[in-house]
Every structure is written in C-alpha cells, then in structure tokens.
Amino acid sequence: LMGGFAAAATLPCQPNSKLYDAKLALKYSYSMENFYRQLESASVEDMDHDGRLDLYVPSLGYAVPVSGTMLVCASSYQRVQAATKIVQDLNALGFDLTLKSVDYEEYLTLLRAGNFDLYYGEVRLSPNFDLSPFFQSGGSLTYGSLADSTMQSLCNRMLVNSGNSYNLYQRLCDRGYLTPVMFKNYAVYTTRGS
C-alpha cells in the first residue's frame, strides 16, 4: 500500500502496535461470506432484478435502492484514487454510490453540515490511538452525528486501562462507525555521515 509506506488495517490501530488485537481483527476482516450474511440479515437484496441492491422500507411500503454519495477531499490524488477504488468495488457488489471530490474548504463545510452518506478521510491519531474526537459531543471529528456516550466511555476506559481496547474496537466494528483502511508509516532517509 502507498508504495510500502502503509499497512492495511481492520481495527483503528497500527497493526504493528501492541494495542492491535489480531484475533479481534480476524473476526472483522474482509469476508464475502460475512458481507452477504449482513446483507441478508438487513433484508438488503436486488428486489427488482436491476443489478442494484434494494432495501424494503415498511413505512414507505416499497423498496428503495441502496445508494449514496462518498465525499473525498480532492487535495490528495492518493485519497481520491483510494476512494474511487472503494466506490467502484462497492458498486460492483450492487451498491449505487457516487464519488464527490471537492476542495478542502468545501470538504470541511460538507462534513460539518453532515451533508454526506460516506466520507473518505485521513486522520492522524495520537500515539495512544485515542478515538475520543470521533465520539465526544462537539468532538473535532464528530461528523455525521457520531457523538455516542457509550463509545466515549469506552474510549475513556481504554485510556485509563492501559490500552485495553477490545470492547471499544468490538463495538466500533459491530456498529460500523468507522472503517479503517490503512495506517501510514513514516520513514526518514539519510546518507552515511550526515
């Protein structure tokens, strides 16, 4: 990934960190079998046989396509490229997603207004992998109404309990709040004698 400067991740923690629970990550790792099981449990299927997934909405009395827009900041070619690949892959599975690539200022405006269905973002976490900014009321990363007192409590417990993150990561994955893609690695290159 990214020319060797990133590692794929299932949990919101650097995979080489002692905080990364490989067993839990395996439970939530990529699996088409689990994907189709989740669709079935949510009653999502191609009901009108048009190649697109639909969700029956009882209050409406009919099915609606599973569609939406993924927002990405256009200032990074790599981010746009990654978001494009994600949208293409999800559409190949039957979703009806479009990608909206906008400049940084508009990206922030749309995030703050909650005017998106999905967004591809890049976040630099603190060394202790604190996720509080995503879940605390008024948090700097609480976009799309992610404020959740239970998640905030689990974040606090993880910080107090020396990185015991199992319950936090399990709830995060069960709820689908965040989907980690990768963690960047940084390197400093020097020449001998410098």
Could you describe each region identified by the protein language model?
Residues 1, 7, 19-20, 98-107, ...:
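Extracytoplasmic/peripheral linker and loop segments enriched in polar/acidic and small residues
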Residues 1-5, 17, 39-46, 90, ...:
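Sec/Tat-exported extracytoplasmic proteins
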Residues 30, 34-37, 78-92, 106, ...:
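Extracytoplasmic/secreted proteins, especially bacterial periplasmic and envelope-associated proteins
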Residues 70, 91-137:
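Periplasmic binding protein-like
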Residues 1-88, 167:
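Append "and occasionally in soluble cytosolic enzymes with long acidic Gly/Pro-rich linkers
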